[in-house]
Amino acid sequence: RAGIEIFVTGGVGGAHRGAQQNFDVSADLEELGKTNVTVVSAGVKAILDLPLTLEILETKGVPVLTYGTDEFPEFYTRSSGIKVETVVNSPLEVASIIKSKRDNKFDGGVLVANPIPEQYAMDRKAVDFAINKALKRAKKDGISGKNITPYLLKTIVEITGGLSLEANIQLVKNNAALGAEIAKELANL
């Protein structure tokens, strides 16, 4: 055990599109289900099956908190159309939930979905177009399994002319700032 309570990333892994047939589900979900860590991300990577990923997290008892919105963010975009039950509006509120979970000895992680800042958010139709084009290329090129995520992300950067990479950089910075504030509040509780 490393004792890391807050972990920041761009987007968590999850169930790939078609996971009902090929069972391609990221180990991120298994870890969140059993490891006492709070992950701050811009949601789930947009290339994944968001509803299925959220269902798996619910099944594993992982609280999903959205920061400042009642809609689950979709990585490059601020919204996915998926409504969530638990909205948090301050780092202190997140820290209080983490502390309550810890004090009550509930094992497993917490996912804090923090939308990309509006000025860096991409157009949802453009993102969907890039993802669908990348998925078609992957199928044509025979890419699957552990190679699919890096292939898709690289291809999406090419298709978007680098806009997705810039969005990714900005959302990680945004998540790091929120994660630091949550950690500070948690240390003071």
Regions from the language model: what does each represent?
Residues 1, 6-8, 24, 29-34, ...:
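Solvent-exposed alpha-helices and their adjacent loops that cap or buttress functional pockets
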Residues 6-11, 17, 39-41, 64-68, ...:
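General beta-strand structural signal in soluble alpha/beta enzymes
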Residues 13, 68-73, 113-120:
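Glycine-rich beta-alpha junction loops
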Residues 20-58, 91-96:
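Active-site glycine-rich loop that binds ribose-phosphate moieties when present
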Residues 76-103:
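Anionic-ligand binding region
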Residues 108-171:
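A C-terminal functional module that forms or caps the active site or interfaces directly
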